[in-house]
Amino acid sequence: MKKFLHSLSAFLLFAASLTASLPCGAQTEVTPYRPGVTTEGITYFLPTTGLHIVVRAHRVTYAPGPYAAFAERFLEARNVEQLPTETWTLTDIDLEPFGTANREQAYTIKLNPKTSAPLVSLAPDGCLLAVNAQAPAVSALTQPSVIRSTPRTSSRSVETQEMLRAGNLRTKAELAAQEIYDLRENRNLLIKGQAEFNPKDGEQLRLMLEKIDQQETALTAMFVGTTTEDDHVFTFDYVPTKDVEADEIFRFSRHLGLVERDDLAGNPIYIEVKNQNTLPEETLDPKADKKKPTDDLRYCNPGTARIRLFTADRTFVDQMLSLAQFGRIEHLGGALFNKKFNTRVLLSPTTGHVEKLDLETQGQ
């Protein structure tokens, strides 16, 4: 994820309170500016945590050969399928947490012309990544892909002139079978050293046998068919908003692969989200100023949720993950951002929590 930096010529003014908090889901006053530098300060968002679901599946595709009906007659190959088939296997499901801007959690760092110039790093969607520090690059999410593990072979390239000129399918099949038997005989003669044209050395013999094997495989496929295999990666996003016990996210069919939730041809895959309520209850100091600071740095103290992805008979994912939306917003007081200190802050692009806080006294 790219980030852009804003170097400002004004000082940062925050409220005097070092720490305070308010519910993460509470509605906030949003300054009507786009994220970035404004006349009043720096407008930024805090993130909501989404789940990038990565589904991996293996597909086996069978295509019958044009001479499948004659496989037993000419090659003595029994039980050859004459109809195409496609078989899918759900191999794995992974979760990749990511952050996306929460438009309801927008804040502005107000500036004072008497304070020092900070360096602020924002994500492209406006989420705050760093103050007075260089934010590291965000890891890219897995993208959909298809990887073929079995190459397709073309049988047409090994058809002889007699096969091409044959008037009916049965004759073509008979000629193809005879060509297979001829290739097998030639292989045996080469191995025994009795061929009409013997190879000069071992390497030439290897190449000749390899060519015969390729031709026999292609011709045999015209009777017994071809099987190809490939690995598919599907991805989609899910943003938890509350506890759910068994929310159906997609279906998977042995014959169709990944299908929509309303397609009853597939079996359902569910997600369970359970807030662990790991954050302690907020305690208020009766002597503290009840007025909430409005111009200091906000960050999220995320909550923890248990995430499960499962079917009726298998669990694919069972993880504890930090989610911004299950936490609350905290304040980093303005006392840390004045001319006495050089404060550097790194925030998580996924949850908005403070990953690193460096504090140096000016002049040291």
Predicted regions and their residues:
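Hydrophobic helical h-region of N-terminal Sec-dependent signal peptides
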Residues: 9-18
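Positively charged n-region of N-terminal signal peptides that target proteins for export
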Residues: 1-7
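N-terminal amphipathic/basic membrane-interacting segments and domains
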Residues: 27-364
